[in-house]
Amino acid sequence: VAICSPLLYSTVMTKRVCMQLVVGSYMGGLLNSLTHTCGLLGLPFCGPNVINHYFCDIPPLLQLACSDTHRNETLLLAFSAVIALFTLFVITASYMLILSVILKIQSDDGRKKTFHTCASHLTAITIFFGS
């Protein structure tokens, strides 16, 4: 909205919309973490309880379980794939819209300024998804 329709930004991005975006993000994170936590709570752990990692993550915990963890691994893969693909889709779609607006700008100077506004964020996104 800020690049494609800058004059409509304050009209579209009301406090209500911002709160809905924040609550939606938190609810998605809560659903993701609760699913994995409840799945891990149902697993029996026996034997060594030392995790040879810097921080406690789901795959090392699954290795300590002494029962079948296929369901947990499937949930982990599914949630990770859905979150990554949804994020990639939203970012790609927004940059396609931004690119179409940039290409419609008549002046070279205006096109350069608008592109340079997005270039640093686009570089960071490319590095993040590329690594």
UniProtKB/Swiss-Prot annotation:
Major place of residence: membrane
One Gene Ontology molecular-function label: odorant binding
Cytoplasmic membrane side: 1-16, 104-116
Glycosylated residue positions: 72
Superkingdom of origin organism: Eukaryota
Membrane-side (Extracellular) residue stretches: 42-82
Bilayer topology annotation: Multi-pass membrane protein
Record GO cellular component, one term: plasma membrane
Record field: transmembrane: 17-41, 83-103, 117-131
Swiss-Prot/TrEMBL keywords: Cell membrane, G-protein coupled receptor, Glycoprotein, Membrane, Olfaction, Receptor, Sensory transduction, Transducer, Transmembrane, Transmembrane helix
Keyword Transcription: no
Keyword rRNA-binding belongs to the record: no
Subcellular compartments: Cell membrane
Role description: Odorant receptor.
Sequence similarity: Belongs to the G-protein coupled receptor 1 family.
PANTHER family: OLFACTORY RECEPTOR
Protein name (database record): Olfactory receptor-like protein COR9
Organism: Gallus gallus
Gene designation: COR9
